[in-house]
Amino acid sequence: FYPRMRDQGHGHIVNTASISGLVPTSLMAAYSASKHAVVAFSETLRAEAESDGIHVSVICPGIIDTPMAHTTELRGGGSEGVLGKLPSPPFPVEEAVKQILAGVAKRRGIIVIPKEANALWRAYRKSPEAMLRINQKTVGWLRKLTGADET
């Protein structure tokens, strides 16, 4: 599809990552690493594709109310009980779609939704060390809540 977009002089590639691709996520190291790779790929392709008239966006959603949000397992333990203890409920799919499409229409490179995920990303960019300490405390809470192990 890239050659066709290049030949026509325009196009828009949209990749899906996660807020975990921008902010390290406790007890989800492999998932977080894979999503960081999607973000890096997208940002690199964005720089390369611009001269061909091709835009690239990467979607980095927080917890969206999809089956995945209700079935994701943390390393060494389940997810049961985690969603109900989060500061805010999973974001509605319909609203997520609206915000994603608005970001694509504005040709944003990185689209972070909902606002809570965006706040988390801003906090991480401002102070990675402070977020590391918060993440370290979150590990204990998640392990206790889910029975996740330390490996």
Enumerate the language-model features and the residues they cover.
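Residue(s) in the substrate-gating loop at a strand-loop-helix junction
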Residues: S18
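A short helix-coil junction within the Rossmann-fold of NAD(P)-dependent oxidoreductases
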Residues: F1-G9
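A transmembrane-helix-recognition feature enriched in membrane-embedded lipid enzymes
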Residues: R108-W141
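Active-site helix of classical SDR
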Residues: S34
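SDR active-site lid
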Residues: S51-K115
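Hydrophobic alpha-helix immediately C-terminal to the catalytic Tyr-X-X-X-Lys motif of short-chain
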Residues: A37, F41-A49, I59, M68
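Active-site loop immediately N-terminal to the catalytic Tyr-X3-Lys motif
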Residues: V23-A29
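Active-site-adjacent segment of SDR/Rossmann-fold oxidoreductases
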Residues: R4-M5, V23, T44-I54
